[in-house]
Structure formats: C-alpha cells, structure tokens
Amino acid sequence: MLIKKFLVAAFLCISSMSSFAAGGSFQSVLTGNFEWKSIDTVDGSVMSGAFQGLGMVVEGDGIFNSGMASRGECLVRVRNHPGGRDINAECTIDYPELDSKMFMLLERKAGDIANAGAKGDGVQTILGGTNKLKGITGTCSYSIKYLDAVTTVSNNNCSYSM
C-alpha cells in the first residue's frame, strides 16, 4: 500500500512538472524606437524600419516570471496600397535571465503608424526560440501606441506551449 501511494504521488508530481513546462501565458510591455525609410511605389508606398526596445513581463506563469526583462529587435515592413495597409515585422526577443531568445512574426492590417497618437492592434506568432525557449510556439495579441513618429509602447498578451 505504501508503494502504491508513493507511485501515485510521484506520478502526480511528474505530471504537474511536465504540464508546468508545457506552456502558459504572460503579459509584457515593450517600449522602444524605430528608424524609418520610405519609398513610393506604383500603387502606394513601402516603408521599412528597424526597431530596438526594452520590455518587461508584468504578469506571467510557467517560464515567464513577472519582472523578467527583455530586449527586442525587429525589422518592419509597411506596405500602403489602395486596399489598405499591411504591417509585418520579424522580431528577436532576448531574455537574458533565461539566456534565451524568442523569434516572432508580428502582423497588423489596421491602425496608423509612425506619427504621434498613431495606434493599432495586431497578432504575433511565436515561431520558436533558443536554449530554454527551444520549441516554444504560441500566439499573442498586441496593442501599440506611438508617442511620436519613432517612439512606441506596446502591450502584449501571449499564450504559449513548449
């Protein structure tokens, strides 16, 4: 009977550890600056930019703890056309406390960009990571606001699995 109780306790402990490592959710805030370049095209314009910023997890579970800091770098492409605007960014987020990086694709088709008061909502896809974030996937919703033409603040709500 004692062995049976031990095996049940061990199973529950291992199960809870694997589900803890299997995923979770977190909310983060990221602020930073863009450097933009733009050209006209036959049906609108294309704008590209590089982003660098700093972030912090404000609420999280699993591997992402509240107070965890990050550095972000993105290459952004904005295409203005008669049907609207497509905004895409490929980003690398570095989490020094985890000695790991996370790779993301951001997409947005609504809202404004690159002027004071501009804002919009979009979707981020977590594509993978390195070291402790190897195998991570997931999605995030985000809201971004421009304080001026180059300075932004974004709020990100993510769920992930490993």
Predicted segment positions?
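Acidic/polar active-site rim loop that often engages polyanionic ligands
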Residues: L12
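Sec-dependent signal peptide recognition
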Residues: L2-A9
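Beta-strand-enriched cores of mature, soluble protein domains
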Residues: A22-M162
